[in-house]
Amino acid sequence: MQSILTQETIIIALIYLSLSVLYLLVIPAVIYYYLNTRWYVASSWERGFMYFLMSFFFPGMLLLSPFLNFRPQRRTLKA
């Protein structure tokens, strides 16, 4: 009888783990940084792309949202 944990099974499990970490943690963190730097100067097309990224990576955004909470910036009024 062969072992349940063959080399191929371990490799497939590591691929699944790395893809899930990438989808749930790494890419949403990069998107948070991108949104934080470009939110107030984005064009309408770029804003639509931002909304797409938010909806596509929503589970990761939801997972990171308690830890990364960016407050809106104050407006600078010129007298």
UniProtKB/Swiss-Prot annotation:
Transmembrane segments: 10-30, 48-68
Topology of this chain in the membrane: Multi-pass membrane protein
Class of enzymatic activity (EC top level): translocase
Pfam families from the UniProt entry: NdhL (PF10716)
Keywords in alphabetical order: Membrane, NAD, NADP, Plastoquinone, Quinone, Thylakoid, Translocase, Transmembrane, Transmembrane helix, Transport
Subcellular location: Cellular thylakoid membrane
Domain of life: Bacteria
Gene Ontology molecular function: any one: oxidoreductase activity, acting on NAD(P)H, quinone or similar compound as acceptor
InterPro entries: NADH-quinone_OxRdatse_su_L
Coiled-coil stretches noted in the UniProt entry, renumbered to this chain: none
Catalytic activity: a plastoquinone + NADH + (n+1) H(+)(in) = a plastoquinol + NAD(+) + n H(+)(out); a plastoquinone + NADPH + (n+1) H(+)(in) = a plastoquinol + NADP(+) + n H(+)(out)
E.C. code: 7.1.1.-
An annotated GO cellular component: plasma membrane-derived thylakoid membrane
PANTHER family (alphabetical): NAD(P)H-QUINONE OXIDOREDUCTASE SUBUNIT L, CHLOROPLASTIC (PTHR36727:SF2)
Oligomeric and partner information: NDH-1 can be composed of about 15 different subunits; different subcomplexes with different compositions have been identified which probably have different functions.
Family: Belongs to the complex I NdhL subunit family.
Function: NDH-1 shuttles electrons from an unknown electron donor, via FMN and iron-sulfur (Fe-S) centers, to quinones in the respiratory and/or the photosynthetic chain. The immediate electron acceptor for the enzyme in this species is believed to be plastoquinone. Couples the redox reaction to proton translocation, and thus conserves the redox energy in a proton gradient. Cyanobacterial NDH-1 also plays a role in inorganic carbon-concentration.
Stated name of the protein: NAD(P)H-quinone oxidoreductase subunit L
Species this protein is from: Microcystis aeruginosa (strain NIES-843 / IAM M-2473)
